Amino acid sequence: VFAARLLDTSVTQFSSQVGDARTHATDPGVARAVALLRAQEQIVFDPADGSRLTWDNAGTTARGRSGRPVFPRIDPAVIGLIQNSDGSQILLAEHARRSGFFSCVAGYVEAGECVEDAWRREVWEETGRRVYDIVYVGSQPWPTTGALMLGFTSRTDDVEQVGETDGELVHTRWVQRDQLSSLPLAREGSL
């Protein structure tokens, strides 16, 4: 962990040449190092007794006076493709906080919610569309935010928005695969 911090300091000096954690998000070693460093910076006190935590040498477990293990926080999130009913188009979103780029719909899983229901809810809240044929396709750690992204595909019969949205998106757009290269997409490693 100490070596990773030294490396992080060096990388900051040369970030335009080597990128940042998002650039290397698919590298498991980078994802793990970023997640563990993030945990040590953000989880400082024992939730059981308020004492300062001491992390083990691997940076994977901390303990305070209570002796109970404290682990890095991982926030489950859903992300995925929404296809029209015949699968010929996908729905992309332009987020209000990152206008000018298109990406997939995504959001966090709420307490007590299964991931499939989280996907349905996020699509409904952000796009005002109902989805079905929800299929889990894989996961990826998202160390810069502490998330574990759970990827899905789904279909909708709702070509147009049928419900109110939460305002997170500027707008949505149906596209065919051959149109993707002409769109301003979010860079790899970002939403």
Task: Annotate each language-model stretch with its function.
Residues 140-163, 173:
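Active-site-adjacent beta-strand/loop module that shapes the phosphate/pyrophosphate-binding cleft
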Residues 44, 55-104, 108, 130-131, ...:
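N-terminal strand-loop-strand
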Residues 95-96, 139-141:
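An acidic- and aromatic-residue-enriched active-site/binding cleft used to recognize and process polar
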Residues 11, 70-72, 160-161:
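Short, charged/polar, Gly/Pro-enriched secondary-structure boundary elements
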